[in-house]
UniProtKB/Swiss-Prot annotation:
Keyword Hydrolase among record annotations: no
Function per UniProt: Involved in the gluconeogenesis. Catalyzes stereospecifically the conversion of dihydroxyacetone phosphate (DHAP) to D-glyceraldehyde-3-phosphate (G3P).
Keyword flag Transcription: no
Principal place of residence: cytoplasm
Gene3D superfamilies xref list: Aldolase class I
Alphabetical UniProt keywords: Cytoplasm, Gluconeogenesis, Glycolysis, Isomerase
One Gene Ontology cellular component: cytosol
The encoding gene: tpiA
Subunit structure: Homodimer.
Protein name as annotated: Triosephosphate isomerase
GO molecular function: triose-phosphate isomerase activity
Active site: H95, E166
Biological source species: Delftia acidovorans (strain DSM 14801 / SPH-1)
Chemical reaction(s) catalysed: D-glyceraldehyde 3-phosphate = dihydroxyacetone phosphate
């Protein structure tokens, strides 16, 4: 059975003292010898703290974004090499909030994924449709377009990707795609990956739309849902640990 992956996305939340408490609780509560990979995507200023607090544990450190550039006059940006310096294993790319508030295009997201891979950081490529797009029957078209840009850019490195489906209408709204709705989109993404790779079944597909302690088990039971990209629930140790337990 494929190992599940649970990634907590803290977004722009946290503080030194609160982080220490949360990370300690996660380390102490993580099941020994569990069958799920776990990582936390923390704000960039806390990468060093997270790496230090989690040293020796099975919990990986993830970034929330990465630059498509290697270096240069890009004020405020962080390169993949910089992330590697802090022991970062994963980085989100193309999160809907980056696309919406920072104008990131499919092409930019694809370049970011490529930049991460080049430095040994695993990109978690986020795709998903808005409510208007879903109601217009465009879900499949939108997610396939977003993923196609990345597949084209990374070429033979496709098997090193992680993909997260995050229906934009279900992020932070309390609304969640039903397990059946989520599985339907995941199956579309799996088929798209299979057309580009003979090892598509090894590529982790995460669900990222308001997964919580109550719905995680049902979502994770779906055939093509290989884990979760967890937002608000990852800020509460008990809830996040419940989700991790559901993935075992």
């Amino acid at each position: 059975m494929k190992k599940k992956l649970i990634v907590g996305n803290w977004k722009m939340n946290g503080g030194l003292a609160a982080n220490a408490v949360l990370l300690k609780a996660l380390k102490e509560g993580l099941p020994e010898g569990g069958n799920a990979g776990v990582a936390v995507a923390v704000p960039a200023v806390y990468l060093a703290q997270a790496q230090a607090e989690l040293e020796g544990s099975a919990i990986g450190v993830a970034a929330q974004d990465v630059s498509q550039h290697e270096s240069g006059a890009y004020t405020g940006e962080l390169s993949a090499a910089m992330l590697r310096d802090f022991g970062v294993r994963y980085t989100l790319v193309g999160h809907s909030e980056r696309r919406q508030y920072h104008g990131e295009t499919d092409a930019v997201v694809a370049l970011k994924a490529q930049a991460a891979l080049a430095k040994g950081v695993t990109p978690i490529v986020c795709v998903g449709e808005t409510l208007a797009e879903r109601e217009a029957g465009q879900t499949e078209e939108v997610v396939k377009r977003q993923l196609a840009a990345v597949i084209h850019q990374v070429g033979q490195c496709i098997n090193e990707l992680v993909v997260a489906y995050e229906p934009v209408w279900a992020i932070g709204t309390g609304r969640t795609a039903t397990p059946e709705q989520a599985q339907q989109v995941h199956a579309v993404l799996r088929a798209q990956l299979a057309a580009a790779s003979q090892q598509a079944d090894r590529i982790a597909l995460l669900y990222g739309g308001s997964m919580n302690a109550s719905n995680a088990a049902q979502l994770l039971a779906q055939a093509d849902i290989d884990g979760g990209l967890v937002g608000g629930a990852s800020l509460k140790a008990a809830d996040f640990l419940t989700i991790i337990a559901a993935a075992q």
